[in-house]
Amino acid sequence: MPTVTWDHIHLRSPDPEATAAWLQDILGGEIIRGPGRIDVKLGGANVFIAPVNASDGVNSPPVTPYQGLDHFGLTVKDIDAVAAEIKAKGVEFTKEPTTIRPGVRICFIRGPQGISIELLERDRKYA
């Protein structure tokens, strides 16, 4: 079996600057400018954000449920405090913080261009 590690997620956005700013302001990412795109270091991986224009012939995001990438998840410490902090910044929650099983609490937020982002907190004693 090959050994793999996460390197990046590549997003396309009609406003890469705004998308990068959101990832920085809401999730604490570090903006790094790359050739032809903006990169954001986030949680040990990179988010590449390339521009897309309406004239590029790109389809709108599909209505859920659909096949393909559904969301990406990020671990946090003290999910309730994080949720309160980002809610105060106006972030839309599609699922409020909840316990899904002992030791695991999650919530879902709506990111730029409707991206679904899961925040989760794991209590290692249940791992």
Task: Describe each PLM feature range.
Residues 1-5, 30-73, 84-110, 123-127:
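Vicinal oxygen chelate
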Residues 19-24, 86, 114:
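Conserved active-site tyrosine of GNAT-family acetyltransferases
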Residues 119:
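Short glycine-/small-residue motifs
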Residues 9:
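Histidine-centered catalytic micro-motifs
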